[in-house]
């Protein structure tokens, strides 16, 4: 089977072009519903159901549309129906990632994942975001993931760049220096 990135690219590009063609289209809300649908499609139980040949595409569509938090827009319903009818539901998480990349490219921003040993409050996250935007030279869309193994500090991943200021990383550097 073809790689998911190859399958997902035309769907992500078509969705992006369709959103860009609509006057006053809100790409942020589109990213939100695409991400939500991707999370549902990535669920192992949904995958198992989608792979079951006894389940019709209409049943699968109704199930997924019924699970989302808010009612789907017509565009979201049509997009989901196309993916299901073409047997491409497994590509939806990759479609979401590529769509986010297209939106970020247009806005000149990047997604950044902040790994922290402890929860970060809104004020500290805003301050961290401002300093990271200065460091990376672009607007960042921050998301936080807790990782207690870091002991303290943060590790930030922006695309393929990583900034690691965690206690764990410093301890590993000290260990390497002492062993060498």
UniProtKB/Swiss-Prot annotation:
Q: Which InterPro entries match?
A: ATP_synth_OSCP/delta_N_sf, ATPase_OSCP/dsu
What subcellular locations does the record give?
Answer: Cell inner membrane
Principal place where this protein is found?
membrane
Q: How does it sit in the membrane?
A: Peripheral membrane protein
One of its Pfam families is OSCP
- Write out the GO MF terms: proton-transporting ATP synthase activity, rotational mechanism
- Where does the signal peptide begin and end? none
What keywords is this UniProt entry annotated with?
ATP synthesis, Cell inner membrane, Cell membrane, CF(1), Hydrogen ion transport, Ion transport, Membrane, Transport
Q: Can you list the GO cellular component terms from the UniProt entry? A: plasma membrane; proton-transporting ATP synthase complex
Q: What does this protein do?
A: F(1)F(0) ATP synthase produces ATP from ADP in the presence of a proton or sodium gradient. F-type ATPases consist of two structural domains, F(1) containing the extramembraneous catalytic core and F(0) containing the membrane proton channel, linked together by a central stalk and a peripheral stalk. During catalysis, ATP synthesis in the catalytic domain of F(1) is coupled via a rotary mechanism of the central stalk subunits to proton translocation.
Similarity annotation:
Belongs to the ATPase delta chain family.
List, alphabetically, the HAMAP family matched: ATP_synth_delta_bact
Query: What is the protein's quaternary organization?
Result: F-type ATPases have 2 components, F(1) - the catalytic core - and F(0) - the membrane proton channel. F(1) has five subunits: alpha(3), beta(3), gamma(1), delta(1), epsilon(1). F(0) has three main subunits: a(1), b(2) and c(10-14). The alpha and beta chains form an alternating ring which encloses part of the gamma chain. F(1) is attached to F(0) by a central stalk formed by the gamma and epsilon chains, while a peripheral stalk is formed by the delta and b chains.
Q: What is this protein called?
A: ATP synthase subunit delta
Q: What is the lineage of its organism?
A: Bacteria, Pseudomonadati, Pseudomonadota, Betaproteobacteria, Burkholderiales
């Amino acid at each position: 089977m073809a790689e998911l990135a190859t399958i997902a690219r035309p769907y992500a590009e078509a969705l992006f072009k369709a959103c860009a063609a609509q006057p006053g289209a809100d790409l942020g809300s589109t990213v939100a519903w695409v991400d939500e649908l991707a999370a549902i499609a990535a669920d192992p139980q949904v995958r198992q159901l989608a792979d079951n040949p006894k389940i019709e595409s209409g049943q699968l569509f109704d199930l997924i549309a019924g699970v989302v938090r808010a009612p789907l827009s017509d565009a979201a319903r049509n997009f989901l129906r196309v993916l299901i009818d073409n047997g491409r539901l497994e590509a939806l998480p990759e479609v979401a990632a590529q769509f986010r990349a297209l939106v970020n490219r247009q806005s000149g921003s990047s997604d950044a994942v902040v790994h922290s040993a402890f929860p970060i409050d809104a004020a500290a996250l805003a301050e961290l975001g401002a300093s990271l935007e200065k460091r990376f030279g672009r607007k960042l869309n921050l998301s936080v993931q807790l990782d207690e193994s870091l002991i303290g500090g943060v590790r930030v991943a922006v695309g393929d760049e990583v900034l690691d200021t965690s206690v764990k990383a410093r301890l590993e550097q000290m260990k390497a220096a002492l062993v060498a």
